[in-house]
Each structure stands twice: as structure tokens, then as C-alpha cells.
Amino acid sequence: MRGLLLAGALALPASVFAHPAHQSYGLNRRTVDLNAFRLKSLAKYVNATETVIEAPSSFAPFKQQSYVEAATQHVKMIAPDATFRVVDDHYVGDNGVAHVHFRQTANGLDIDNADFNVNVGKDGKVFSYGNSFYTGQIPSSAALTKRDFSDPVTALKGTTNTLQLPITVDSASSESTEGKESYVFKGVSGTVSDPKANLVYFVKDDGTLALTWRVETDIDSNWLLTYIDAKSGEQIHGVVDYVAEADYQVYAWGINDPTEGERTVVKDPWDSAASEFTWISDGSTKYTTSRGNNGIAQSNPNGGSSYLNNYRPSSSSLSFKYPYSPSSSPPSSYIDASIIQLFYTANTYHDLLYTLGFNEKAGNFEYNTNGQGGRGNDYVILNAQDGSGTNNANFATPPDGQPGRMRMYVWTESTPYRDGSFEAGIVIHEYTHGLSTRLTGGPANSNCLNALESGGMGEGWGDFMATAIRLKPGDKRSTDYTMGEWAANRPGGIRQYPYSTSMSTNPLTYTSVNSLNAVHAIGTVWATMLYEVMWNLIDKHGKNDAPKPTLRDGVPTDGKYLAMKLVIDGMALQPCNPNFVQARDAILDADTALTGGENQCEIWKAFAKRGLGAGAQYSSRNRVGSTEVPSGVC
């Protein structure tokens, strides 16, 4: 579950952090703790300074050899005995670095958590790479030939029983689909769509390889990939959850919540370079409501999974102006304003991210990609005042080509209640789950932020982007920001500490993670480090307070947007399920690729200040901190 608050019980009452109640679907976490089944961080990341293996003499530059061929050649050199396939989601980022992803195979089946990502520079040489390929003994194919494993229905029933899923499988049957040992289930009730199963291998925690069924079940509040042992039909080896917990009268971009300004009317606010069909068309149909190529926003008071026929305001004159006051009650009385605010914030963020490199080929959320690459049919489903919970929000990120799903809730910690759609930081935080999940490991793989530390960084990226966007013209290095303060009606916000460059106000360092086991708490540490990076870059390059960056040769000219750009580029470089050290290296590599490394000193100083210096070492049980800045970078 990737939501705003779940598992982050640092300051608010327990009720605020409980899993949202759902009227029909949902996993009872008090009985089954999905964190116990999180994937482990297996990857090694070789950064740009460590990639010293020169291309062999037979190597041809880009013009003669494609970047896919160059990357494939590199994988064969590093893992000569491995069999693998190229994942069909490779692309060249707007910084000129190509990203190619590979999946290891065995006996014709995927090893689902064995990945290799290769980043190829403009010169056609390998820039950096991540590797979690399995190096142990590959099982004999005899078990497959003899079909010495359970049938898919047994796997579905085992998954349902072990995780106590609220679905009915008594009449379940399986039908073969395209692909080796791929099935869809019929006769199942309680799911959004028909469950699926694929026979795959999975690297277990003990380093051995298990034949498993990957069972996919979307129960709305949780969209799960469960790896259940194919022989026993009972033992679960890992679980991935895709869910992260005209004229428009709105709080304009940069106003985080009603305490920071008044609503205004904005006209045709889209960026035509990012939203070529505007926000209210998908290239084939022009809409007169909160629907378009990037998102579809509606009310969802019952908390169900249907959305196309849900209520959304309509205006034949395209004048989306509706009354709202923070003192109004109940929230349903201003649902029109809520839907339009959510639609506006999500679309504006889509356009900004597009400018910063999260475009169609990188796996962004668009119904019609207009021939620009990537897979379409995946705008974001935006549910305002979703009835499946309160005091939270969440975002589901399936692979590219399937819609993202954001649920915004009403917050009940104040009188009158407050609507989370009016706090932009919450919307941005949730949407950033989609950004980081699509970029890390590639658009086709949504499994790469499911280890505890990488999941924590997923929360931290959301907080960082939300905080960077709300900076004001008069802000200085000494300015502190909280998260979720307005919606939760809590002056100190919903995190353990405010985001601050003061070690007195916020003392978090890398070794703080040793005592943390919740993703939101870990994310606060990561976002604190990124806040330091941003202010170091602002001190060097200044701060652009406009809603969009000024680019020179693709590089933001100011420190705020440069920090955001490097963070985004780093996501695409880092390996599957990265740790803090690897994500730090990816940001440093992003600077090398984008600027030639002119900001290495500022970035290293920021991380070193918070204990993630050159000598920092990752261990899931005992992280070692360091304040060392490498010699020669400053």
C-alpha cells in the first residue's frame, strides 16, 4: 500500500494511521502484515566513476550499433552464463542517456526478481548499470516437463487463504492465455478485474531459486502480485503491492493549501508542449468535464472501483467555477470544486514532470501517447472524496499501459472536515509514487520500489517534490516546511520532523534508518537529504519561482528545478529496489550526465552532512554513516 501516511505513525493518533476502511474490498492488515513479504534489495549498482570497463575493440558507436545492442553486449560480458530477454520499454532520456532493461530467464520462464539495467551514454559507451541477476545453479527443466507443480487454481486459493484476501474463489477456474504457463481466472468475485497467474522463478531470501506462481489480484485497496511456491501451493516467497497508499477556479500552482492564498480563475492553464490535446481532450474526443488525456477526475463516495459513470461536473462553456470555503460542511456540498482542484493539480504536475523528462517514452500517464513512444491507455484515475477511507490518500501504479489510480480522502481531524484534494502537497506526493515507480526499473516493471529502504525512498521522493514545488519567493535556506499540516489539522505536520537544513530542528541522518522499520519514517530521512541537496544547488544557481523551469540545453538554470531534474534522472539510472547509497550515486551520476558533473561538490556536501558521505555503507541491519566528501570534488 503506497499511501501518504500508512505505517508512518510518528506523531499522529493511531486512528490517523490505520488502514482506510473499505466498504467492499481491502486487506485487513491487523491480521496479515504485507511488510513481512516485501521483496529484498538484491541489486548491485556500478556508478559512472566505477564503470571503467572499456568497450571492446569490436564496439561500434551509436550510429553503427544501437544502444540496445551495446547494452546487450555489456550484459553478456558481465553475465556470460545467463539467459535473459530485453524488456520492451527501453528509451533515450532527454539528458541523452539511454535506459535498457533486461529480465533473466531460466528454462524459458522469467526469474521475476532478477533484473539488469544498463544506462548507455551519448558516446555509445556504458555509463552505469544495476545488476540483480541470479548467479546460482539453475534448476533442471524436468519439473516443468513432468509438470511437477501445482495448478494455477491451487495457487490462487493458497494466496487467498494465506493473505486472507476478501475474495471468493470456490468456483474459480483457469483459462490459458498467450504466453508460456499464463492463465486468467474466471468465477472469482470480489476483485476489480479477473485475477491472473504466470509461472515464474523467484530468488528467495536464502539465495536459492524457487518455482512460483505469480498471482495478480486487484482488490481495489491493494493490487497485489503474490509469489507463491508452485510445489506446495501455500508458502509465499514475496508480495508486491502496486498501490501506494478552460477556466478553472482553483488554488493556483504553488499554493499548497487554503492557508497560503485565495482561489483564482486560471484560463487554459495547460502546457501545449506537454499536453498537446489540452487537458480536456484525448485527441479523438473533446470533453466538457474533468476528463482528458492525462487524467479523469470524479467523485467516488462509495469507494468502489467503477469510475467512468461516476459524477463529474460538466460545463458546455468550459467554465469550471464552483463555490468552496474551508468552513463549508459537509464536504459533499463542494464536491464540484474538489474534483476540479484535483484535476487541475494532477494535470499541472503532469505538465511539469513532462518538462523535466517524464514523458511518453519514459512511461508517463497518458491515454493517447500520439506516437511519441511508451504505451497508452493509462491516464490517472483521480477519485475525489473517495469513500473507501479517511485521513489518508493512495496511488496504485501498475506497469505502463494500465491506468494509475489515485484516491483522495476526506480528513476528519478537524471541524469541519477537510478535503485532501485542497492540499496540493498530498496530491503531488501521491502522483510522485507513479513517477518513481515507472522510472525505477523501467516503465514495464512496477516491482522495483518494494524493498523496505527503496519503499521508504518512494515516500521521501513524494515529500521532496511536494516541498520543492511549494517554495515561496522569500524562502531562504533557513525556511522549514512540514507535510500534511493543513489536512491533518496538526501544526507540526505528519512527519517526525519538519524539512529543514538545521540539524537542531531536524537531526535525522543515515544511521537514523537503523532504528526505523516503517516506510514513511525512512522516507522522511531521504527527503531531508534531498532538501539539503536542493538548498546547496539554490545557493549556487539561485531559485526560479516561476511554475516552470527555464532550460538551457536541457538543463534547468536554477537550483530548485535542477535538484528536481537530477532526482528524476537518478530514478531512471538506479537499479531495481535501490538502497540510499545506490540512489545517492544515481543522483551524482545524473549530474555527470546532465551537466558534466559541475555540481558534484554541492551534492556530496549535502549527503555527507546527513551521514551519507563517501564512506557510508548499506546493511539492512547496521548502516554505517559517513561525513566524508571525496577528495578532489570540491
UniProtKB/Swiss-Prot annotation:
It is found in: Secreted. SUPFAM superfamilies: Metalloproteases ('zincins'), catalytic domain. Residues 1-18 form the signal peptide. Zn(2+) binds at residues 429, 433. It is an enzyme of class 3 (hydrolase). Gene3D superfamilies: 3.10.170.10, Neutral Protease Domain 2 (1.10.390.10). It comes from Neosartorya fischeri (strain ATCC 1020 / DSM 3700 / CBS 544.65 / FGSC A1164 / JCM 1740 / NRRL 181 / WB 181). One of its GO terms (molecular function) is metalloendopeptidase activity. Belongs to the peptidase M36 family. GO terms for biological process: proteolysis. Induction: Expression is controlled by the prtT transcription factor. Keywords: Hydrolase, Metal-binding, Metalloprotease, Protease, Secreted, Signal, Virulence, Zinc, Zymogen. Binds 1 zinc ion per subunit. CDD domains: M36. The active site is at 430. Its cofactor is Zn(2+). InterPro entries: FTP_domain, Fungal_virulence_M36, Peptidase_M36, Peptidase_M4/M1_CTD_sf. This is Extracellular metalloproteinase MEP. Residues 19-245 form a propeptide. Secreted metalloproteinase that allows assimilation of proteinaceous substrates and probably acts as a virulence factor. Pfam families: FTP, Peptidase_M36. Coiled coil: none annotated. GO terms for cellular component: extracellular region. Its EC number is 3.4.24.-.
